[in-house]
């Protein structure tokens, strides 16, 4: 009995570190002989505001149950995204899903989250404070969230790039100032 209580307490502590945002609820109807039967689908984004984020989809006959299922699915599907200075992206990225396309751009301090609807929920739960994002094509919340995640999966820190190329981080990051200096001289 004590083991089960410890497991429940550990689960509650782990869950308390996450922030979840409800992005969309969809009501669907099944027509039966006696009338309509309603069901609900929920899209939830969950994150720790420190670089981990996930999204989930849940369906049920009642809204709270659909949200609970979506939250559980989101916690199981979390990804880690490297953040620059813990507040923005390292570089600009594009993402696609279906007809939805998103463009995410790193922003200077004080910019805030400039993003529409479902993308804003992703950035708030991720812990991004400064970003500029544009959604093109589909405005379907599912496609927008999936396209945003596609873009975030392509995000790479200078450390990751340096490891892949077999170089030092200073060689990767140092090029920004070298390139700017060369451009200014010529």
Swiss-Prot record:
One of its GO terms (molecular function) is structural constituent of ribosome. It comes from the Bacteria. One of its GO terms (biological process) is translation. PROSITE patterns: RIBOSOMAL_S5, S5_DSRBD. The keyword rRNA-binding applies. Keywords: Ribonucleoprotein, Ribosomal protein, RNA-binding, rRNA-binding. Gene3D superfamilies: 3.30.160.20, 3.30.230.10. Residues 18-81 form the S5 DRBM domain. It holds the Pfam family Ribosomal_S5_C. One of its GO terms (cellular component) is small ribosomal subunit. HAMAP family: Ribosomal_uS5_B (MF_01307_B). The N-terminal domain interacts with the head of the 30S subunit; the C-terminal domain interacts with the body and contacts protein S4. The interaction surface between S4 and S5 is involved in control of translational fidelity. Part of the 30S ribosomal subunit. Contacts proteins S4 and S8. With S4 and S12 plays an important role in translational accuracy. Belongs to the universal ribosomal protein uS5 family. This is Small ribosomal subunit protein uS5. It comes from Parvibaculum lavamentivorans (strain DS-1 / DSM 13023 / NCIMB 13966). The lineage of its organism: Bacteria, Pseudomonadati, Pseudomonadota, Alphaproteobacteria, Hyphomicrobiales.
